[in-house]
Amino acid sequence: MEALAKHRFARTSAQKARLVADQIRGLHVEKALEVLAYSPKKSAALVKKVLESAIANAEHNEGADIDELVVAKVFVDEGPTMKRIKPRAKGRADRIFKRSSHITVVVADN
């Protein structure tokens, strides 16, 4: 039994979110929540919310026992990038890339 949760268009870069996702892949959900709770990264809070949603989906939709759930899959794909302009000296301008990502978490029982 698998349950899935997604956060699309998360306002963090995929590269930064993957650092957090790699830490919880394959862990028991309770241990994964602990790791995310004490991580100082902004992406950890986003991934934690998606993991909590996946756990709730498993319990409500599939009737799964929370104590037996593990993080089966977690992956982060790139979302669209918003391009902005930052004015600089002497009439120049720099491009600012505001990146987004799609975070997906799949939990399954052993």
From Swiss-Prot:
The keyword Phosphoprotein does not apply. CDD domains: Ribosomal_L22 (cd00336). Keywords: Ribonucleoprotein, Ribosomal protein, RNA-binding, rRNA-binding. One of its GO terms (biological process) is translation. GO terms for cellular component: cytosolic large ribosomal subunit. InterPro entries: Ribosomal_uL22, Ribosomal_uL22_bac/chlpt-type, Ribosomal_uL22_bac/org-type, Ribosomal_uL22_CS, Ribosomal_uL22_sf. One of its GO terms (molecular function) is rRNA binding. Belongs to the universal ribosomal protein uL22 family. Part of the 50S ribosomal subunit. This protein binds specifically to 23S rRNA; its binding is stimulated by other ribosomal proteins, e.g. L4, L17, and L20. It is important during the early stages of 50S assembly. It makes multiple contacts with different domains of the 23S rRNA in the assembled 50S subunit and ribosome. The globular domain of the protein is located near the polypeptide exit tunnel on the outside of the subunit, while an extended beta-hairpin is found that lines the wall of the exit tunnel in the center of the 70S ribosome. This is Large ribosomal subunit protein uL22. The lineage of its organism: Bacteria, Pseudomonadati, Pseudomonadota, Gammaproteobacteria, Alteromonadales.
